[in-house]
Swiss-Prot record:
NDH-1 shuttles electrons from NADH, via FMN and iron-sulfur (Fe-S) centers, to quinones in the respiratory chain. The immediate electron acceptor for the enzyme in this species is believed to be ubiquinone. Couples the redox reaction to proton translocation (for every two electrons transferred, four hydrogen ions are translocated across the cytoplasmic membrane), and thus conserves the redox energy in a proton gradient. NDH-1 is composed of 14 different subunits. Subunits NuoA, H, J, K, L, M, N constitute the membrane sector of the complex. The lineage of its organism: Bacteria, Pseudomonadati, Acidobacteriota, Terriglobia, Terriglobales. This is NADH-quinone oxidoreductase subunit K. The gene is nuoK. It comes from Acidobacterium capsulatum (strain ATCC 51196 / DSM 11244 / BCRC 80197 / JCM 7670 / NBRC 15755 / NCIMB 13165 / 161). InterPro entries: NADH_UbQ_OxRdtase_chain4L/K, NUOK/Mnh_C1-like. GO terms for cellular component: NADH dehydrogenase complex; plasma membrane.
Amino acid sequence: MVPVAYYLVLSAILFSIGVGAFLIKRNIITIFMSIELMLNAVNLSFVAFANYWRQINHQFSGQIFVFFVMVVAAAEAAVGLAIIIALFRSRSTLNVDQVDLMKL
């Protein structure tokens, strides 16, 4: 059985990659994907903790919480992609520096 610490280290690495890409990249799609990577890193840590606590308490609350986070992430992805498509149609670019103003 793989120790929980390995999953937490992997989750921290994925979250760090997501934060780094969020801070460095200027493309809206890349920023959006880095936010999704951070959400999935948090989901991985929730599942790891749920598996660890399931061995002790025999409860599945962590997996249920991950399911709700995935539902919210799917809704966020749909709304985010719709906003990105609308920005691309109006500005013809996906560069954050060029679409930072909320005007036509």
